[in-house]
Amino acid sequence: MKRLVCVLLVCSSAVAQLHKDPTLDHHWHLWKKTYGKQYKEKNEEAVRRLIWEKNLKFVMLHNLEHSMGMHSYDLGMNHLGDMTSEEVMSLMSSLRVPSQWQRNITYKSNPNRILPDSVDWREKGCVTEVKYQGSCGACWAFSAVGALEAQLKLKTGKLVSLSAQNLVDCSTEKYGNKGCNGGFMTTAFQYIIDNKGIDSDASYPYKAMDQKCQYDSKYRAATCSKYTELPYGREDVLKEAVANKGPVSVGVDARHPSFFLYRSGVYYEPSCTQNVNHGVLVVGYGDLNGKEYWLVKNSWGHNFGEEGYIRMARNKGNHCGIASFPSYPEI
């Protein structure tokens, strides 16, 4: 993955110098200062500048269309603004759906049960602060611990950040996971079941890199007895589970620039597919100006979207695959 980034930098450096728009110099420096961007070499900065300008143009045109009522969300030049969508996917979105996928659908739906029009588990104190996974494809681990954190809060009354690094380091080949090179939420749950626990984030902090497994049972903060999978593509069942059980781990198609540059509103990308590549956590749902949405917690830091969250279109034909592989753990 990192080799791909290096090749991009080398091949593009000369071209970058030719295409730089000097009228954007001041804004480039402001953006770098805002997000603490520093580059090791001039060639790297030249390439990043070119990518940044391309993304800036994309954001400006999209937001112009948004102002004319053509989109239900707007974009912003966040901390990922100097990256291509290919880089974001390579470094930060590495969901590995098992190739021989055999789902064990155990969720029992009750279609006659009346559900609330909106749910936000943050309001019930069941969601920890937004994390930043950095240049490590650990989205699956953050999605998994987020779902278990909510179950821990519901059972014990205590909200504890659990260790994503524990999963990155220890839930590995046996479970089909590859640390920073990707994994899947249900296999992470299975590791916690087999291991009889997971450490707290405080005792086993996140390092954004693969390490030797350092799990210590004396720092165990939560256990998992089983996990439940929901039927493929059923947004009605996903709504029921989110309302009645708690936050649900899901995968989405996040490969579009409109996703990683999302700022606010209800995200709807016509090019989105149901081929999921990024693990996130559905923590609620609702309606914004007539647009139904899923409230989704990401792991790209507070500078992404709405303080680290994105509202994704709901009841739009399983948009971006959000209801393709939902699951949640139980204690």
Curated annotation (Swiss-Prot):
Residues that make up the propeptide are 17-114
Family annotation (SMART domains): Inhibitor_I29, Pept_C1
* Record: active site: 139, 278, 298
Q: Which organism is it from?
A: Homo sapiens
GO CC, alphabetical:
collagen-containing extracellular matrix; endolysosome lumen; extracellular region; extracellular space; ficolin-1-rich granule lumen; intracellular membrane-bounded organelle; late endosome; lysosomal lumen
Give the UniProt keywords, A-Z: Cytoplasmic vesicle, Disulfide bond, Glycoprotein, Hydrolase, Lysosome, Protease, Secreted, Signal, Thiol protease, Zymogen
Where's it found, cell-wise? Lysosome; Secreted; Cytoplasmic vesicle, Phagosome
Q: What is its main location?
A: other
Q: Does the keyword Disulfide bond apply?
A: yes
- Mutating residue 104 to Q: what's the consequence? Abolishes glycosylation
Subunit record text: Monomer.
SS bond partners: 126-224, 136-180, 170-213, 272-320
Top EC group: hydrolase
What's this protein's name? Cathepsin S
Q: Which residues are glycosylated?
A: 104
Pfam families reported for this sequence: Inhibitor_I29, Peptidase_C1
